[in-house]
Amino acid sequence: MLDEFGPKRIIDTPIAEGGFAGISVGAAMNGNRPIVEFMTFNFSLVAIDQIINNAAKMRQMSGGQFNIPIVFRGPTASAGQLAATHSQAFENWYANCPGLKVVVPSTPYDAKGLLKSAIRDNDPVIFMESEQMYGDKGEVPEEEYTIPLGVADIKRAGTDVTIVSFGKIIKEAHKAADILAKEGIECEIIDLRTVRPLDFDRSEEHTSELQSLVIIS
């Protein structure tokens, strides 16, 4: 990436999360669309003042004079050989902060399409990935495409019960659905993809059809 885009666009910063998160807010206010990578979202706590009090609130505090199109991305939750301070899941923290959008993809295809949309969005987006899924493989088109934020996806059709989840837990939902299928229970799997905003309409629609809902988080 450095060879392709150059040092003015690809910046290897010191490990000072509050500093580079703050710089990204200023860059966004000046018309750029920065992508900030945290080594792990556990370290985003060092920058939480910049994320919560500046990035998330700036458009409202400025009366709409500034957009803050930032993507904060990186791995979240547990993975192999990580200590407790590197294994926390912060989806619910950020999803409860007004002004932020929270995206948690479950497949390579979704990751590309959602990241493209996150970069184009005029609000700050928390883009969370599972380190346990970095080795996953899947079909990803080379051509340009986007996936709209806030739209859930039906990953598996079923007629008996709806399972709703997101991120790496979608794989566990598929395992559970395979087991239940052997018992004659057909599970539908809905991948939220975006934790904030939630696609309540699709979840409610399919739950009302099947009358049975299981939420896994």
Which residues make up each language-model segment?
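Generic preference for hydrophobic/aromatic residues in regular secondary structure cores
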Residues: 10, 152-155, 216
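Short, cationic motifs built from Arg/Lys/His that form the positively charged side of catalytic pockets
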Residues: 128-131, 212
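Thiamine diphosphate
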Residues: 1-124, 128, 131-204, ...
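Residue-level marker of intrinsically disordered, low-complexity segments enriched
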Residues: 13, 145, 212-214
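Residue-level detector of flexible, active-site-proximal loop/helix-junction positions
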Residues: 17, 109, 134, 194-196, ...
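Single conserved hydrophobic/aromatic residue that forms the stacking wall/gate
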Residues: 205-217
